[in-house]
A protein has these predicted regions:
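Alpha-helical support elements that line or immediately flank enzyme active sites
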Residues: 110-116, 130
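Short, contiguous hydrophobic alpha-helices characteristic of membrane insertion segments
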Residues: 2, 236-240
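Long hydrophobic segments that form regular secondary structure
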Residues: 115-120, 238
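Surface-exposed loop/interface segments of Gram-negative outer-membrane beta-barrel transport/assembly proteins
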Residues: 1, 13-18, 24-107, 125-233
Length: 240
């Protein structure tokens, strides 16, 4: 038995510079062998998304509502945006559209399960899976709306390893019934992270793609993380 599915979505919002894209792929297969005594199940799943989101929804739409429509849509001869002086602390909506709040996410998972009937009442089961995830975030605020500008890049990754093996026995005779199970399980997770925040940009042309051109790093804005917890367990039960 083989199954495959595929999905793709391209979502364009009312704000032309913002959009969302999602891609999903899934494959599954089930196979029997040795006259059905061995059953194998295999699956692969992949997901990818790209999101170009609004940095501050409330600020953007309030700015659009408060903007004087007689003002130019772009910058003046000096490269500055003309603001509505009657609206306090409100930037030109055109300048706010240069803000970026982008993210990318990728997920991958695969698993394999086996079930083998050694005897009619003795079953060996095994299952293993691997998962990988990656999330990237990137933000940019130009100097028109943020003093000295603001740039942020972050990437976070995760891996999960899981395996399970069990042996079960089931038998009945007369008025008696016996169930016995013994199993072992292991789980390991790895998490890594790296993020950088910077200010003091001299030009808005590079967006978040040239952090090296910035002049300052806020305290605590640059760091990394790593952790790798694991868990192993053994269990058994007998019911008579």
């Amino acid at each position: 038995n083989y199954r495959a599915s595929f999905g793709f979505m391209d979502h364009n919002t009312i704000v032309k510079v913002n959009d969302y894209r999602n891609l999903v792929v899934k494959l599954d297969a089930t196979q029997k062998a040795f006259d059905g005594r061995l059953v194998g199940d295999f699956g692969v799943y992949g997901y990818s998304s790209k999101i170009h989101d609004i940095f501050d929804t409330r600020m953007l739409f309030y700015s659009a509502a408060a903007q004087n429509l007689t003002y130019p849509a772009g910058t003046d001869v000096n490269g500055n945006w003309v603001k509505n002086s009657a609206a306090s602390h409100i930037n030109h909506p055109g300048a706010l559209l240069y803000e970026k709040n982008d993210s990318e996410e990728r997920n991958f998972n695969t698993h394999l399960g086996l079930k083998f009937n050694i005897l009619d009442n003795l079953i060996l089961s095994a299952f293993g899976s691997y998962s990988y995830s990656s999330t990237g975030n990137a933000q940019f605020c130009p100097t028109w709306v943020w003093a000295q500008g603001n740039v942020y890049r972050g990437e976070f990754k995760g891996e999960d390893y899981f395996t399970n093996v069990s042996l079960s026995y089931n038998n009945a005779w007369g008025d008696s019934h016996l169930d016995a199970v013994v199993g072992a399980e292991y789980l390991k997770q790895v998490r890594t992270g790296l993020w950088v925040q910077a200010k003091g940009i001299t030009t808005n042309d590079f967006s978040y793609n040239n952090i090296g051109a910035t002049s300052s790093r806020p305290f605590g804005g640059t760091s990394s993380s790593y952790e790798d917890p694991s868990l192993a367990s053994i269990m058994g039960s007998v019911t008579y």
